[in-house]
UniProtKB/Swiss-Prot annotation:
This is S-adenosylmethionine synthase. Its cofactor is Mg(2+). Catalyzes the formation of S-adenosylmethionine from methionine and ATP. ATP binds at residues 139-144. It comes from Thermococcus gammatolerans (strain DSM 15229 / JCM 11827 / EJ3). It catalyses: L-methionine + ATP + H2O = S-adenosyl-L-methionine + phosphate + diphosphate.
Amino acid sequence: MVEKVRNIVVEELVRTPVEMQEVELVERKGIGHPDSIADGIAEAVSRALSREYLKRYGIILHHNTDQVEVVGGRAYPQFGGGEVIKPIYILLSGRAVELVDREEFPVHQVAIKAAKDYLKKAVRHLDIENHVVIDSRIGQGSVDLVGVFNKAKENPIPLANDTSFGVGYAPLSETERIVLETEKLLNSEEFKKKCPAVGEDIKVMGLRKGDEIDLTIAAAIVDSEVSNPDDYMAVKEEIYEAAKGVVEEHTQRPTKIFVNTADDPKNGIYYITVTGTSAEAGDDGSVGRGNRVNGLITPNRHMSMEAAAGKNPVSHVGKIYNLLSMLIANDIAEQVEGVQEVYVRILSQIGKPIDEPLVASIQIIPKKGYSIDVLQKPAYEIADAWLADVTKIQKMILDDKLNVF
C-alpha cells in the first residue's frame, strides 16, 4: 500500500500570544440562549437522522439540517410564576433523504421527536406541548441505495461536498477557560439541584485588560422559583459565588464579576423568565450565530464563520474540518513540548477525499528557547495521523463525544 503524502505545512507564526495582548474578549452563549437552542436542535436532528439511517439501511444517507430558526414568543413573567402568552416558534429546515428505493423514510417524525427530546433536556422549565410550536419543513431528497453502497465501496474515504475550511487553536487562555467553565458550571446538573431558579439562558462575557479581568454574566432567572425580589437577589449571590470559585481555580489575576447588570430594583426591573430562556420574550435564534466548535466566540483568535451544527457528519467539511482542526491543535499543544500557541486551518476541495485536504496549515508560536525546526516534525505527524483516521470523527460525533457549540 502506498502511503499518502498529504499537503501539511508547518510554519512559525510571528505574532503576540493572546495572553500577552493588552485586550482580550471572550464570549460564550449558554445552552438556553436562542442561538444555542437553534444549534442544539439542528445537531440533535442530524444525529437522530444519522442513527436512524444507520439502523434501517446500514449507512448514513445525505442530509443537512443546519437551517433552524427560533422565533421568539411572548411571556408575562412575575415573581411566583407567570405565563407564556405566545409560544416560541421553531422552524426545522434543510435537506434529508426521504425516499429510499421507493420506500418513504419518516424524516419529519424523526426530526420533530429529536427536537422535542433535546428541548426537554436543555431547557427544564419549558413546557414542550404548550410553550413551543415545532414545524418541520425539511426538504425532500431521494436515493438509490444500491448506488449509494457502490459509491461507498469505490470511495471508502468520503469526498468533500464543499470547498470550505475549518479552524482550530490551542491551548485556551485563562480568560477563555474561565468563560467556558463558568457557563458549564452554572448549567451543570449539580448546580441546578442546588439553585433551580437559574435558567439555562446564560451568557458569559469575559474582558481582560492587561492583568485585570471583568466577567459579565447574564442569567435568566425562573420566576416560579423566586417569590420576591429578596429571593431573586439571593440567587444572584449564588451565581456570583459559583463564578468566583471558577475564577479562583483558573487565575490569580484580579477579577471583577458582574451578574445581571440591567437589573433596576428601584423600578422593579429584574431578569426573570417563565421558562429560563429569553426566547419566550421575543429573542430569536439562528444556527451558526453563536459559539464555535470549541464552545466559545473569540475575536482575538482565527475563526471560521461556518455553522457546524446540523451538517452531516460524513462528508460535510464545514463540520468535520472545524472539529478536526480543534482536535489536531489540542494534541499538538498537549503532546509537543515547546508550543506556546498553535493554530490549525484545513481547506478542502469539493469532490476530493476528505483525508487529502488542499492544505492543512499549522502555525506555531514557539515558547521562548524553542525553535520551529524542532516542532515541525511532531506537529506534522500528529496532523497526518488525524487525517489518516479522519472518518473517526463521524463515530465520535454519533457517540456524543464531540460538541459543536
